[in-house]
């Protein structure tokens, strides 16, 4: 019955897609650089993107996404505990959109205004800040079959209006010798309740992804996501600790690199949005292992 329910919810999620919130963004620069794919890797940098298994507690992850001067997104993840069969992770995401202008009181809304009708003294700058707290529980259900559940409270303030919301995800990863399959159901029961009285709801979203090791040094990634369609990516190991990546989806061309050091992993992604508004963006992330 449980398996049937999972299949029904997953199929239903592919019928609707409208998920514009801070959790809808891919957080790991590695996954961004391969086309913004939910690729699974047992690293705390994947806390927001897919289920993971960890072998130690002392892992901290920090990343920053910079979208020109329009907005920035910050991610922080920490492992609360990690065992052979399960782990519990805590994450925080913060999106800040600055340099917004409120013109509601600058003129009377009776059509297109003449320049002399605009009172520029009534135009003021305001910010849009959204903060999410992620509680991720991952468990090994069977050999190479991982299940993850994400609980996602969210707080959002736009100018002088605030909201509080909640949603959760159910995600799975199946690992095989040379490839893996992952799929997820996101934004389950997602909503925001604004202090203005508005109840904002978000539709279910789903994805299905695969990664295939075509050689010892090359991995091909593919994902179909209801929000963004098809995505394709490639990761190549140049030397033991250096990786080059590239990806493509319907909106972006991406590439980047990864460098694995003794105590720190560094990942960088460059995003060409093909957009005059967002132009080209950058994402950088650090995974710090405190055990070594």
Language-model regions, residue ranges each:
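Sec-dependent N-terminal signal peptides
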Residues: 2-15
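Subset of outer-membrane beta-barrel
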Residues: 18-292
């Amino acid at each position: 019955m449980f398996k049937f329910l999972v299949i029904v919810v997953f199929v239903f999620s592919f019928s609707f897609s409208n998920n514009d919130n801070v959790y809808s963004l891919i957080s790991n620069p590695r996954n961004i650089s391969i086309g913004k794919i939910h690729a699974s890797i047992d690293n705390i940098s994947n806390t927001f993107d897919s289920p993971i298994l960890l072998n130690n507690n002392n892992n901290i992850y920090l990343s920053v996404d910079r979208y020109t001067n329009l907005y920035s997104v910050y991610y922080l993840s920490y492992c609360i505990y990690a065992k052979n069969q399960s782990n519990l992770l805590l994450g925080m995401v913060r999106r800040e959109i600055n340099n917004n202008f409120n013109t509601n009181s600058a003129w009377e809304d009776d059509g297109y205004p003449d320049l002399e009708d605009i009172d520029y003294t009534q135009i003021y700058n305001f910010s849009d800040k959204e903060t999410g707290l992620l509680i991720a529980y991952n468990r090994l259900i069977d050999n190479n079959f991982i299940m993850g559940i994400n609980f996602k409270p969210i707080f959002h303030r736009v100018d002088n209006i605030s909201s509080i919301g909640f949603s959760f995800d159910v995600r799975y990863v199946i690992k095989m010798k040379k490839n893996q399959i992952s799929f997820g159901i996101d934004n389950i029961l997602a909503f925001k309740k604004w202090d203005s009285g508005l109840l904002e709801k978000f539709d279910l979203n789903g994805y299905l992804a695969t990664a295939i090791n075509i050689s010892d040094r090359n991995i091909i990634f593919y994902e179909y996501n209801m929000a963004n369609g098809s995505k394709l990516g490639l990761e190549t190991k140049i030397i033991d600790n250096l990786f080059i990546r590239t990806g493509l989806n319907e909106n972006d061309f991406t590439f980047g690199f990864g460098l694995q050091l003794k105590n720190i992993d560094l990942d960088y992604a460059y995003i060409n949005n093909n957009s005059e508004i967002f132009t080209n963006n950058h994402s950088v992330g650090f995974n710090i292992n405190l055990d070594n």
